[in-house]
Amino acid sequence: LVVTRARIRLPHPGLQATVDVLKAADLSDDEVQRMAAQYVRYCDAQNRVAPAGDPYAERLARLTGRYVAVNGIPLNFKVYKTTAVNAFATADGSIRVFSGLMDRLGDDELMAIVGHEMGHVRNHDTIGAMRKAYLASAARSALGAVGGALGALSASQLGSIAEQYASAQFSQGQETL
């Protein structure tokens, strides 16, 4: 049996559960990095990115300029111009900082957040989140195979793996150093 990375929907939920378990077991760092790069391109297109020369971009570049890679993964930093207070990192080394966060923090505090995000890249936390997403999908598919009320609830799949990935929160274990 060869399982590819294409997201396919099989007619029987039990088969889909098997495929998702196999995907979770076979997921590689390289594959997660490719998916992360696609996700970041999408996010960058959906947000106002501070251009070179923007005060936010210059501040972040000044603070992060010496950090070029973590465990061989090239880092790239950008600022999203929004009032939201957030920052995130993805498996491909992309780190995005929101201007609303930058407005509230001094340089040392901001670098503590950036360092924290770099830790997610270093620890390969995204691959664990993706494995959990595939296993959750497998569990929903398995419930769908049962039929009845559980099957009907599972039939909606309670969201896709992409949604889980996009909204994945790192566990407390991943948040501690």
Task: Please describe what each predicted stretch is.
Residues 1-177:
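A Zn2+-metalloprotease active-site environment signal
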